[in-house]
Curated annotation (Swiss-Prot):
Family: To A.aeolicus aq_1900.
Transmembrane regions: 1-21, 111-131
Membrane topology: Multi-pass membrane protein
The protein's name: Uncharacterized protein aq_1446
Keyword Cytoplasm on entry: no
GO cellular component, one term: plasma membrane
Lineage: Bacteria, Pseudomonadati, Aquificota, Aquificia, Aquificales
Keywords: Cell membrane, Membrane, Transmembrane, Transmembrane helix
Species assigned in the record: Aquifex aeolicus (strain VF5)
Length: 185
């Protein structure tokens, strides 16, 4: 831009005829303009350098921010992985505990079956013992009763009773069946 102004001024000076003083004044003015332009360009360069530095600072800040953001993201990912591991461990621990509870229930169920079997066996044993005892006592009582009757009854009385029963059995079919059953007819 500065060159364009100089060329424009130079061309303008040829088209006009200037006196040597005017030419000197014009050259001074051009020199002042040139100096001013150089100062302006220097200031603009300094400002551009400052702007460049600011952009570099902003870029550095963005890079730092991005780095911190990446670090934060990596830290969050690590924490999420740790949380996932904890959940997996917790799930495995819960599964183990449920398996232990299931085993305990199975043991209790088996124990209840054993108790039921023992109770059933005891009940059956008591019933069988009561039945056996009753039969034994009844048989023994019958035998003792017959023996006592035989002792009380003399053989002669016993024969008379048996003869009376045999005669009654001729008319009573039920009594006849009973006597035959015991081999008394």
């Amino acid at each position: 831009m500065m060159k364009f102004l100089l060329i424009l001024i130079f061309l303008a000076s040829f088209s006009f005829s200037l006196t040597p003083e005017e030419e000197k004044q014009l050259l001074k003015d051009i020199a002042e303009i040139k100096t001013t332009l150089k100062a302006f360009i220097r200031e603009a360069d300094e400002r551009f350098e400052q702007v460049d530095k600011r952009f570099e600072d902003v870029n550095r800040r963005f890079e730092d921010f991005n780095r911190r953001l990446n670090d934060l993201r990596e830290d969050m990912n690590k924490r999420f992985e740790l949380v996932d591991k904890r959940f997996i461990e917790l799930r495995e621990d819960m599964n183990k505990r449920f398996e232990l509870v299931d085993q305990r229930f199975e043991q209790l169920y088996t124990f209840l079956w054993i108790i039921t079997g023992i109770f059933t066996t005891l009940t059956a044993s008591v019933i069988a013992f009561a039945w056996w005892d009753r039969r034994t006592i009844i048989r023994k009582t019958k035998e003792e009763t017959f023996e006592e009757m035989e002792k009380e009854l003399k053989p002669e009385k016993f024969r008379k009773i048996m003869n009376a029963l045999r005669e009654k059995a001729k008319t009573d079919k039920e009594l006849e069946a009973i006597l035959k059953k015991y081999g008394l007819l």
